[in-house]
Swiss-Prot record:
Its EC number is 2.3.3.13. One of its GO terms (biological process) is L-leucine biosynthetic process. Gene3D superfamilies: 1.10.238.260, 3.30.160.270, Aldolase class I (3.20.20.70). NCBIfam families: leuA_bact (TIGR00973), PRK00915.1-2 (NF002085), PRK00915.1-3 (NF002086), PRK00915.1-4 (NF002087). HAMAP family: LeuA_type1. It is found in: Cytoplasm. This is 2-isopropylmalate synthase. PANTHER family: 2-ISOPROPYLMALATE SYNTHASE 1, CHLOROPLASTIC-RELATED (PTHR10277:SF9), HOMOCITRATE SYNTHASE-RELATED (PTHR10277). Mn(2+) binds at residues 17, 205, 207, 241. Homodimer. Catalyzes the condensation of the acetyl group of acetyl-CoA with 3-methyl-2-oxobutanoate (2-ketoisovalerate) to form 3-carboxy-3-hydroxy-4-methylpentanoate (2-isopropylmalate). It is an enzyme of class 2 (transferase). One of its GO terms (molecular function) is manganese ion binding.
Length: 516
């Protein structure tokens, strides 16, 4: 049996730091869906957001805190009373609430960002922890840019915040500057030079600017860290964060070396990765470790021969261990409501009768149009029907004329604020014409940053899944749509992005946490 001192706690910040990745903004329903999945996975702590950033963030964190019972819920707060008070208001109903407060500690940040002395910052750090501690004993403190902070001052700050009541001290590699040997030595140095370090859990938060976030986190574990802050798929600002699935599977696969374990149900990893991709539209690179499309693919004849004879010749873990099924059940037009319901449960979707009815109607429409309906088809339907923002704009009708002679023309009818509007658009191709019609009907003209088409499954009758990224006032959103007709899918994706932008406008004035 695994001993408690060998337990590594997983702190997931997909909903906070991960959401800072360009185009990855999520609405409250999507955040709640991710939080439920994280709870199902066995994540120990969910950082639900930055409550003071906006009213939308506050309400989203509050909703997660009120529903999720199987994980600690953390709210981020800068080292000031207003942030800390607001964070507590958002998370107070959680089964086990945590306030995560932070302040910069490196001389670079003190000089150019805070414009404060070391003494001032130390005093503010202690005061912040004391304030948070007045609400809950579960307080985490982070000295931002710790890897570029003078070690003597870092030790002084860590000792002071632990004395003030911090139960977890997190060491962030904010700019992804450290290398594994150096980062591991830093954790060992803190353990050796902070007298009260045993009174707190040491956590690490690594960024991937040099591609070393996972390696740095593992090095920290070998040197005494017992909590790792990470995100699904490694999503995050700039080059991203520590990928949860990679840390978890490294510890599991090389238990002979590490000797540690997590509480993560690894069979939920792949579904979690797919869900995040569906929601954000941020695709996983094919050669991504653990969850990439090629992670368990072997093309070399020698490798294939070895796998046929004995899988352990070239596979260090099984696809099933991360939730990739080796059996691919296909549904069709004769599949009934119960079969669809049971299949959705296997995919991790426990739907209400009302939700199932919506999905089943879309399923029957799709099954009548194509021979086989695959897992990916069902996932696309579930996302589009159940996890989208409230619609200001809806597609009612689309007809496109195109070819090598005709000028591409799109005639479209939409519902705009419950009013029916019709217009036509022209362009250099059918998609361009469709987008032109949408812009005319909605009176919008945002920058189109990205347009991507993927086949959800194989075959000429595969659904097309389209991702569209639009930019508004320096912020971007991703919309997506799926349909057997790629032009219709494109229209749905563009309209979905517009609806997400409308949500962002309502949540305008959002404050960025600055913490990474």
């Amino acid at each position: 049996m695994d001993s408690p001192e060998k337990r590594i706690y997983i702190f997931d910040t997909t909903l906070r730091d991960g959401e800072q990745s360009p185009g990855s903004s999520m609405n409250p329903a999507e955040k709640l869906r991710i939080a439920r999945q994280l709870e199902k996975m066995g994540v120990d702590i969910i950082e639900a957001g930055f409550p003071i950033a906006s009213e939308g963030d506050f309400l989203s964190v509050q909703q997660i805190a009120q529903e999720i019972r199987g994980a600690q819920i953390a709210g981020l707060a800068r080292a000031n009373n207003a942030d800390i008070d607001r964070a507590w208001e958002a998370i107070r109903d959680a089964a086990n609430p945590r306030i995560h407060t932070f302040i910069s500690s490196s001389d670079i940040h003190l000089k150019y960002q805070l414009r404060k002395s070391r003494e001032q910052v130390l005093k503010e750090a202690v005061a912040a922890v004391e304030r948070a501690r007045s609400y809950t004993p579960n307080v985490e403190f982070s000295p931002m840019d710790a890897t570029r902070t003078d070690r003597g001052y870092l030790c002084e700050m860590v000792e002071a915040v632990i004395a003030a009541g911090a139960s977890t001290v997190n060491i962030p590699d904010t700019v992804g500057y450290a290398i594994p040997q150096e980062f591991g030595e830093l954790i060992a140095y803190l353990r050796a030079n902070v007298p009260n370090i045993s009174q707190a859990i040491i956590s690490v938060h690594c960024h991937n600017d040099l591609g070393l976030a996972v390696a740095n986190s593992l090095s920290a574990i070998l040197n005494g860290a017992r909590q790792v802050e990470c995100t699904i798929n490694g999503i995050g600002e700039r080059a991203g964060n520590t990928a949860m699935e990679e840390v978890v599977m490294a510890l599991r696969t090389r238990k002979d070396l590490f000797g540690f374990y997590t509480g993560i149900k690894t069979e939920s990893i792949y579904q979690s990765s797919r869900l995040l991709t569906q929601i954000t539209g941020v695709a996983v690179q094919p050669n991504k470790a653990i969850v990439g499309a090629n992670a368990f693919a072997h093309e070399s004849g020698i490798h294939q021969d070895g796998l046929i004879k004995e899988k352990i010749t070239y596979e260090i873990m099984t696809p099933q261990s991360v939730g990739i099924s080796d059996s691919h059940i296909v549904l069709g037009k004769h599949s009934g409501r119960h079969a669809v319901s049971e299949h959705l449960k296997k995919l991790g979707f426990n739907l209400s009768d009302t939700e199932l009815n919506k999905i089943f109607v879309r399923f029957k429409e799709l099954a009548d149009a194509k021979k086989n309906v695959f897992d990916e088809d069902l996932e696309a339907i579930v996302y589009e029907e159940l996890y989208r923002v409230e619609d200001k704009y809806k597609l009612i009708y689309l007809n496109v004329v195109s070819g090598n002679v005709a000028i591409p023309t799109a005639t479209m009818q939409m519902e705009v604020d419950r009013e029916i509007v019709q217009d036509a658009g022209f362009g250099v191709g059918p998609v361009d014409a469709t987008f032109d019609a949408i812009r005319k009907i909605t009176g919008t003209n945002y920058d189109l940053l990205r347009y991507v088409v993927n086949a959800i499954s194989g075959g000429t009758d595969a659904q097309g899944e389209v991702t569209v990224q639009l930019k508004f006032n320096g912020r971007s959103v991703v919309g997506h749509g799926a349909d057997l007709d790629v032009i219709v899918a494109s229209a749905r994706a563009y309209i979905n992005a517009l609806n997400r932008l409308e949500f962002l406008k309502r949540d305008a004035g959002k404050i960025k946490s600055e913490y990474e």
